[in-house]
């Protein structure tokens, strides 16, 4: 669906198993659009994290200059 296509993650952690088990550990006011189990802390603004695991990482949400420096 479109939710998976629009989902993004800046910080994705994967195990070294084959296939890998990956989880997005971004913390924000909402979870990404494809998240099924989103846990939010009752704070203002809320701090939400997705606890789904996949065999892949979603694309990055932000292409910051810092990330570009690391790639070069």
Swiss-Prot record:
Keywords: Disulfide bond, Protease inhibitor, Serine protease inhibitor. The keyword Translocase does not apply. The keyword Disulfide bond applies. Seed. It comes from the Eukaryota. GO terms for cellular component: extracellular region. One of its GO terms (molecular function) is serine-type endopeptidase inhibitor activity. Inhibitor of trypsin and of chymotrypsin. May function as a natural phytochemical defense against predators. This is Seed trypsin/chymotrypsin inhibitor IVB. It comes from Pisum sativum (Garden pea).
């Amino acid at each position: 669906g479109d939710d998976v296509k629009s989902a993004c993650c800046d910080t994705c952690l994967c195990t070294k198993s084959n296939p890998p088990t990956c989880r997005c550990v971004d913390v924000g006011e909402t979870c990404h659009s494809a998240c099924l189990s989103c846990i939010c802390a009752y704070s203002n603004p809320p701090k939400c994290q997705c606890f789904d695991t996949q065999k892949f990482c979603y694309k990055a949400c932000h292409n910051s200059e810092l990330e570009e420096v690391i790639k070069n």
